[in-house]
Curated annotation (Swiss-Prot):
Quaternary structure and partners: Requires LJ_0548 for activity, but the exact composition of the enzyme is unclear.
Organism: Lactobacillus johnsonii (strain CNCM I-12250 / La1 / NCC 533)
Function: Component of an enzyme that catalyzes the reduction of free flavins (FMN, FAD and riboflavin) by NADH; the reduced flavins produced by this reaction likely spontaneously react with oxygen, yielding hydrogen peroxide. Is responsible for the major H(2)O(2) production in L.johnsonii in the presence of oxygen. Cannot use NADPH instead of NADH as the electron donor.
Protein name: NADH-dependent flavin reductase subunit 2
Top-level enzyme category: oxidoreductase
Free-text disruption phenotype from the record: Cells lacking both LJ_0548 and LJ_0549 completely lack the NADH-dependent flavin reductase activity detected in wild-type strain, and show a 40-fold reduction of hydrogen peroxide formation upon exposure to oxygen. Reductase activity and H(2)O(2) production in this mutant can only be restored by in trans complementation of both genes.
GO molecular function: flavin reductase (NADH) activity; FMN binding
Gene: nfr2
Family: Belongs to the NADH-dependent flavin reductase family.
InterPro entries linked: Flavoprotein-like_sf, FMN_Rdtase-like_dom, NAD(P)H-dep_reductase
Disulfide cysteine pairs (residue numbers): none
Length: 184
């Protein structure tokens, strides 16, 4: 199984990058997980033609059996870099339709506060379910990781909190089954 884990920010430092890297390492026996950075994607503009970075991004999604989105929360929503990346996959102006159509998607995230990027995750799910995306999002498979600074080692990126690891294990196993069902 081939999964694409998208780091949902262009920030130099991100606990969500640590989260994607943790998943790629922990579940390497269950799936090939490629961590993908969106930092170099150009800002979406409807009139612009997609450059090679955008084409690479769309092709990575097309080639994956499923996509994992790890998003932080900025001002009760997803970062503008992630929104822009999703606009590249959903815009009909550049023939991008169907990049995410029926693609199994998992959304999770971590934040400094107590709510674990809950509003950003909800916004991301709404985007994925929009008519221009039409992704296949597993309902109820949520992982809200609050107080990221207390749960990750800032220097190594290691996830230290066993309760959080258990929650991710459950959600990831659900997602793997979901992807397998979608492939039938």
């Amino acid at each position: 199984m081939k999964l694409l884990a998208i780091v949902g920010t262009n920030a130099d430092f991100s606990y969500n990058r640590f989260l994607d890297q943790f998943m790629a390492k922990r579940y390497k026996d269950q799936a090939e997980i490629e961590v993908y950075e969106i930092a170099d994607l150009p800002r979406f503009k409807k009139e612009a033609q997609p450059d090679s970075k955008v084409e690479e991004f769309k092709n990575k999604i097309r080639e994956a059996d499923g996509v994992i989105f790890a998003t932080p929360e900025y001002d009760h929503g997803i970062p503008s870099a992630l929104k822009s990346a999703m606009e590249w996959t959903g815009s009909h102006a550049q023939g991008n339709a169907d990049v995410m159509k029926m693609k199994p998607a998992m959304v999770l995230g971590t934040s400094y506060g107590i709510q674990g990027a809950s509003r950003a995750q909800e916004e991301m799910r709404e985007i994925l379910l929009s008519p221009d995306q039409s992704a296949n999002v597993l309902p109820g498979n949520e992982v809200l990781i609050g107080h990221a600074a207390d749960k990750f080692d800032k220097n190594t990126g290691d996830l230290l909190d066993q309760e959080t690891i258990h929650a991710i294990d459950l959600a990831f196993n659900n997602f793997v089954k979901f992807v397998e069902q979608a492939q039938k």
